[in-house]
UniProtKB/Swiss-Prot annotation:
Ca(2+) 2 binds at residues 399, 402, 407. It comes from Bacillus subtilis subsp. amylosacchariticus. Its main location: secreted. Ca(2+) 1 binds at residues 360, 399, 402, 404, 407. Residues 28-221 form a propeptide. Belongs to the peptidase M4 family. Extracellular zinc metalloprotease. It comes from the Bacteria. This is Bacillolysin. Its cofactor is Ca(2+); Zn(2+).
Length: 521
């Protein structure tokens, strides 16, 4: 594939300056990440790319020997998170950059090694010029941080429940980069619950003072409004099980043993996941069951798509149960991935019909789960727009009849979004029209549902050039192998180009590059 000993050095130019001469690439000054800045830069001449062995020790030796490229030795400030081997036989070492042993929030470095044990790419955020210590000390315990986070969101731990899912609340000590380039210790607190309403909170608590630095509800939506009409009424096959003298919507047919389970909340917003949908016969035909039938059938197809194309076993690739709850609330105009499961409202009849009736929306939500467990793109600004875009793109890969997203559930307009023509639904289709919206709930966290139109159009350009079969492999590899939580549009472009080169060679990589050039990136 023409890799040889070429090294693609990926560094966040906002964290360190590289004296590398590249056409059209300039290092950023200071510590403020530029929205259109790539952290996937190319460098041909290196001291050594061949590893003595494909392991953590050898990778760090490589980084040390190439310290001139990185403006210092990054090996001492990287902690191995995981190492994986992909279907091509390539190995990928994912590291967390640390300050005084504490991981830096939303930053990763990935070292990529080919089958000949040559390093062919490095990408991520090195923070190689960071201070040796943080500006503050740890005085608040993790238990106290969790309590402060609950207070900040106005909830009591006893007043919320995660239903049948495991308690995933946690407080992890992280180093947070400040605007002046220094670092502070803070707890990255995750609070997830499904009642009295779905929430997936991230709260940053200063580890010294206990002050709240940031709080965000990251429940990820396919849409903000909806409508409600009856479902299509088509007859579809269902994988069910027989339990306690009745048939239930529990799919046990998957060869990996992963279960797909569908519940009915009966218009409640509490006691999730709800009641397991059941029938005295093998048929589920009542009008109240139709939303559940669609959710169950569509999610089975989405699971099959990810498994047959990528051998991915559930959203986390660990075989976790895939849970859906339908009839969430009364006229609830949304579908959402809550961090542990999917919920579907019935809509209000004016904009949406029941949201479980759309295959591409189901795929969109499932992909949020995949993203959460891989690139974990932060849900704001460009990373958040990429999060939404990758969900839309895989929504299309699951439902290739047209380029629209949500066309089966909208009532007052043809669809929610369009990959081929984002401007049809008030989205930009070129970076020149990027909308700098506030990073608030009212500003859609920097326009994650708005600016996703730009990478969506790039995806359309890619698919029309390469076809679905190649494009879906390229997009999956980029999402699971190269992207990191803080990846920007430029990073996504570089990751997709590299993925195309890995899989299909330089000709197709050039087509991906052209697809992104066409949207101003």
């Amino acid at each position: 594939m023409g890799l040889g000993k070429k090294l693609s050095v990926a560094v966040a130019a906002s964290f360190m300056s590289l004296s590398i001469s590249l056409p059209g690439v300039q290092a950023a000054e200071g510590h403020q990440l530029k929205e259109n800045q790539t952290n996937f830069l190319s460098k041909n001449a290196i001291a050594q790319s061949e590893l003595s062995a494909p392991n953590d020790k050898a990778v760090k030796q490589f980084l040390k020997k190439n310290s001139n490229i990185f403006k210092g030795d990054p090996s001492k400030r990287l902690k191995l998170v995981e190492s994986t081997t992909d279907a091509l036989g390539y190995k990928h070492f994912r590291y967390a950059p640390v300050v005084n042993g504490v991981p830096i929030k939303d930053s990763q470095v990935i070292v990529h090694v080919d089958k000949s044990d040559n390093v062919y790419a490095v990408n991520g955020e090195l923070h190689n010029q960071s201070a040796a210590k943080t500006d503050n000390s740890q005085k608040v315990s993790s238990e106290k941080a969790l309590a402060l986070a609950f207070k900040a969101i106005g909830k009591s731990p006893d007043a919320v429940s995660n239903g049948a899912a495991k308690n995933s609340n946690k407080a992890e000590l992280k180093a947070i980069e400040t605007k002046d380039g220094s670092y502070r210790l803070a707890y990255d607190v995750t609070i997830r619950y499904v009642e009295p309403e779905p929430a997936n909170w991230e709260v940053l608590v200063d580890a010294e003072t206990g002050s709240i630095l940031k709080q965000q509800n990251k429940v990820e939506h396919a849409a903000a409004t909806g409508s409600g009409t009856t479902l299509k009424g088509a007859t579809v096959p269902l994988n069910i099980s027989y339990e306690g003298g009745k048939y239930v919507l529990r799919d046990l047919s998957k060869p990996t043993g992963t279960q797909i389970i569908t519940y009915d909340l009966q218009n409640r917003q509490s006691r999730l996941p709800g009641t397991l949908v059941s029938s005295t016969t093998k048929t589920f035909t009542s009008s109240s069951q139709r939303a559940a039938v669609d959710a169950h059938y569509n999610l089975g197809k989405v699971y099959d798509y990810f498994y047959s194309n990528f051998k991915r076993n559930s959203y986390d690739n660990k075989g976790s149960k895939i849970v859906s709850s339908v009839h969430y609330g009364t006229q609830y105009n949304n579908a959402a991935w809550t961090g542990d499961q999917m919920i579907y409202g019935d809509g209000d009849g004016s904009f949406f019909s029941p949201l479980s009736g759309s295959l591409d929306v189901t795929a969109h939500e499932m992909t949020h789960g995949v993203t959460q467990e891989t690139a974990n793109l932060i849900y704001e600004n460009q990373p958040g727009a990429l999060n939404e875009s990758f969900s839309d793109v895989f929504g299309y890969f699951n439902d290739t009849e047209d380029w629209d997203i949500g066309e089966d559930i909208t009532v007052s307009q043809p669809a929610l979004r369009s990959l081929s023509n984002p401007t049809k639904y008030n989205q930009p289709d070129n970076y020149a029209n990027y909308r700098n919206l506030p990073n608030t709930d009212e500003g859609d966290y920097g326009g994650v549902h708005t600016n996703s139109g730009i990478p969506n159009k790039a995806a359309y350009n890619t698919i029309t050039k390469l076809g679905v079969s190649k494009s879906q492999q390229i997009y999956y590899r980029a999402l699971t192998t190269y992207l990191t939580p803080s990846s920007t549009f430029k990073d996504a472009k570089a990751a997709l180009i590299q993925s195309a080169r890995d899989l299909y060679g330089s000709t197709d990589a050039a087509k991906v590059e052209a697809a992104w050039n066409a949207v101003g990136l």
